Structures are given as structure tokens and as C-alpha cells.
Amino acid sequence: NIIYELRPMSVDDFGFKNAIMNMIDKFNRESNVITYYSSINFDDELSIDSNLIISILRIINELNSNAIKYSNGTEIIVNVTLKDNNVIIEFKDNGKGFDYYNTVYDRNKNSGFGLTMLKERVALLNGNIKYIYDNGSDFFIEIPVW
């Protein structure tokens, strides 16, 4: 598992689209409570750097981990699309939501480390992240691919 987390084999073997689909299938198999819905809308012939792909997979994994731990939701929707040379990730759950700003920026709390790392990872990729509370948590992440 540790080696897989560091470098998922499906990235090299199957490409970006299938790596995302395999990861979401893995989430579905491992959960007895959450139902996953996904939409991956791009051509798998894309030539995207494997390190960028791994970073995107880690972002989705972190969002999933947080949703499982904290949302108390029963559904997660993951949409990944390519638009204007950007990978767009929408990650939505139907859980209780939270105050994103205070969780990420309040250093007096002993929480939000995963989200802080997520924010920093997205920034290092020259991307941006937007959070909306809408009957659960809804993240929109945009990352340039070239």
C-alpha cells in the first residue's frame, strides 16, 4: 500500500483516465457506507506529465479521506474534466460541510492539516481551489496541464 501511494502503478500502466477510474473503484470497494459517482470527461490520449498526474491523484485521495473522516455523508461525486488546458476536479459530498476558511487558516486549531497541505499542493501546481457549502462540501480545483 505504501509503495502504491507513493507511485500508483496504474499511472504508468493505464494512463490518467484509467488511473482515476481505478482509484474511484478502489474507494467504492473499500466503503460500506459511501456510494461514489464519477464522471471523467477527457481523451485518455492526453500527454500529461506523470508527476502531475500523481499530484492530481493525491489531491483526490486527500479530499476522499477528509470526506470519509469528517462529512458523515453517504454519497461522493467526483468529476474530472479538461477545459482550456486545465484539469478541473469537482469533488462533492452530501455530508455536513464545514467552515473552510477557519479550518485552513486558523493556526490556533489542531485541525485542518490535510486541507492545508491540499491547498499548498494545488498552489505549487499553479492551480486554484474553491470551496462551496451546498448541502455538503463542494470543492472545485483547477490545475493547468501545460
Residue spans for each PLM region:
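Conserved ATP-binding N-box helix of the HATPase_c
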Residues: I53-E75
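Glycine-rich nucleotide-binding loop
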Residues: N86, G97, D134-F140
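ATP phosphate-binding glycine-rich loop and adjacent ATP-lid/helix-beta elements
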Residues: T103-D134
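Helix-loop-beta hinge of the Bergerat
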Residues: F16-L52, E120-A123
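Flexible helix-coil linker/loop segments in the cytosolic histidine kinase module
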Residues: N1-D13, S71
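Acidic ATP/Mg2+-coordinating residue in the GHKL
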Residues: D93
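Short beta-strand/loop element within the Bergerat-fold HATPase_c
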Residues: E75-N85
